[in-house]
Design a protein with these regions (language model features):
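Short amphipathic alpha-helical segments
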Residues: 100, 177, 318-324, 440-442
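Catalytic cores of soluble metabolic enzymes centered on carboxylation/carboxyl-transfer
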Residues: 193, 232-435, 501-504, 516-520
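Short beta-strand micro-motifs enriched in acidic
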Residues: 148-150, 211-213, 293, 306-308, ...
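ATP/adenylate-binding site constellation spanning eukaryotic-like Ser/Thr protein kinases
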Residues: 152, 226, 239, 318, ...
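Structured functional modules or segments
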Residues: 434-520
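Short beta-strand-to-loop capping motifs
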Residues: 106-107, 326-328, 511
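N-terminal beta-alpha lobe that positions the nucleotide/phosphoryl donor
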Residues: 1-208, 212-228
Length: 520
């Protein structure tokens, strides 16, 4: 606010992070005589609490996933409620979103540990440990509706975005329109999104996120009271400038269009390019220095980036480097254009998600639109680093690497340089130990630079293979490290709050002695 005053600014646009959904900041702007380019703080307050939002939406006739309407005070009460609703369930942060402070629970015996993990993560991320509970929608699609509302009573929707390709409940690839939504369903979901905005007196840009089940039923998830990261794909298919409309609304002017004038054309896809190593499907946050960055160019290709060569990717913030977006007349052409753009993308110095996104776009399940929010982690097996070829593990996040795969899109074949991809389900538990490696000797080491947030064991504890021993956070992502062997905890080398380096030993497990009937 002080910077805005010194600059002589009249308004503040909060972007899509940090303060964008903070009602206290919006109120502080108003008190300082600055226009906050976003929704009113009252609407943000109502939607910021997920339980409050669920109550409001249920009263307004918006379909919500069965679950609790209030915070759950204890793990024991959570277990009782989960039994009533029926497993599997999802524990979620009352004050947050984006997959943080969320745990899926499939068995009663896992409720207590999941509750504590989700609560700790919610407290660290949002300053509020409160949780609520929902029935888990099995293999849903994540479909969201873009809304815009002015101060003259006009509320419109701009259709949907499909955001089902996720790891750790965070989006990696988005597209519009959704291949699972027809015109009738789009109209129904759009009507519900408009109703949700009207229920809280919403103005400016926002997104109503929903889950679409396999039977075609949809449920309210939350309203993101800000401009979304993935808004460019809506801009490309509608031809509208969402930021310009935000400024127009904040200035007190009506929207420049009506619902009937919204026309959607073609297909757009966005890949979020993150500083993560996707090898083995672990998506390990990878801070460091960007030594070279050359995004692709050409018709229908857009790059919204926040870094250039020489910039440092910090371990303390979100690891999004930029957004690669393409538009084409239809989905097959958009897939081909994105495949070509990813192959041309060049970034050196830190690993990126590009190899995973190349694998995703070439997978038959994605090409045929058979994916869901759990598809990436359950169906896509990304290779372990092999050390073979210039693109393996050298920090080159581009398409080069000496390997290629033939990918068929809409009857045409394209050669895409990228690591291999298996179209079989990965090994169970592949994603559970995302931040660490347990050696055969029982030493659990960190694979990334980060901070220990929890130690889950003590010296002398008996652990099973696959049991969590500590949690490490890096770049706003928390990962639980698991023991690779059954045995007894011999040494705990770290404490909560302690920074750790990649490769640093965290916990030492003395392996359980082999029984007489064990194989040699």
């Amino acid at each position: 606010i002080e910077v805005a005053r010194r600059a002589g600014a009249q308004a503040v646009h909060p972007g899509y992070g940090f303060l964008a959904e903070n009602p206290a900041f919006a109120s502080a702007c108003a008190a300082a005589g600055l226009v906050f380019i976003g929704p009113p703080p009252e609407a943000m307050q109502a939607l910021g609490s997920k339980t409050s939002a669920r109550k409001i939406m249920e009263a307004a006739g918006v379909p919500v996933v069965p679950g609790t309407l209030d915070a759950i005070p204890t793990p024991a009460e959570a277990a009782d409620l989960a039994r009533e609703i029926g497993f599997p369930v999802a524990l979620k942060a009352v004050s947050g979103g984006g997959g943080r402070g969320m745990r899926v629970v499939e068995r009663p015996e896992d409720v207590e540990s999941a509750f504590r993990q989700a609560s700790d993560e919610a407290a660290a991320s949002f300053g509020d440990p409160s949780l609520y509970l929902e029935r888990l929608v099995v293999r849903p699609r994540h479909v969201e509706i873009q809304i815009l509302a002015d101060q003259h009573g006009n509320v419109v929707h701009l259709g949907e975005r499909e955001c089902s390709v996720q790891r750790r409940h965070q989006k990696l690839v988005e597209e519009s329109p959704s291949p699972a939504v027809d015109a009738a369903l789009r109209a129904q979901m759009g009507e519900v999104a408009v109703k949700a905005a009207q229920a809280v007196g919403y103005t400016n840009a926002g997104t109503c996120e929903m889950l679409l089940d396999q039977q075609g039923n949809f449920y309210f998830l939350e309203v993101n009271a800000r401009l979304q990261v993935e808004h460019p794909i809506t801009e490309l298919v509608t031809g509208l400038d969402l930021v310009a409309e935000q400024i127009r609304v904040a200035a007190g002017r009506p929207l420049s269009f009506t619902q009937n004038s919204v026309a959607r054309r073609g297909h757009a896809i966005e890949c979020r390019i993150n500083a993560e190593d996707p090898a083995g499907g672990r998506f390990i946050p990878s801070p460091g220095t960007v030594t070279a960055l050359v995004p692709p160019q050409g018709p229908g290709v857009r790059w919204d980036g926040g870094y250039e060569a020489g910039d440092e990717v910090s371990p303390y913030y979100d690891n999004l480097i930029g957004k690669l977006v393409v538009w084409a007349p239809d989905r097959p052409a958009a897939l081909a254009r994105m495949a070509a753009a990813l192959a041309e993308f060049r970034l050196e110095g830190v690993p990126t998600t590009v190899p995973a996104q190349q694998a995703i776009l070439g997978h038959p399940d994605f090409v045929d639109a058979r994916h869901s929010t759990v598809w990436l982690e359950q169906r896509l097996a990304l290779p372990e680093p092999s050390g073979a070829g210039p693109g393996d593990g050298d920090g080159d996040g581009g398409g080069a690497g000496g390997r290629s795969q033939e990918v068929r899109v809409a009857g045409r074949w394209y050669t895409i340089p990228r690591p291999g991809v298996e179209s079989r389900p990965p090994a169970r538990g592949r994603h559970g130990g995302a931040a660490g490696v347990a050696t055969a000797s029982g030493t659990v080491t960190s694979q990334m630079q980060g901070t220990v947030v929890r130690v889950l064991v003590a010296v002398g504890d008996v652990v099973e293979a696959g049991q969590g021993v500590c949690a490490v956070e890096a770049m706003k992502m928390e990962s639980v490290l698991k023991s690779g062997v059954a045995g007894t905890v011999a040494e705990v080398k770290v404490a909560p709050g302690q920074p750790v380096r990649a490769g640093e030993a965290l916990v030492v497990i003395e392996p359980q002695a082999a029984g007489p009937g064990s194989a040699p």
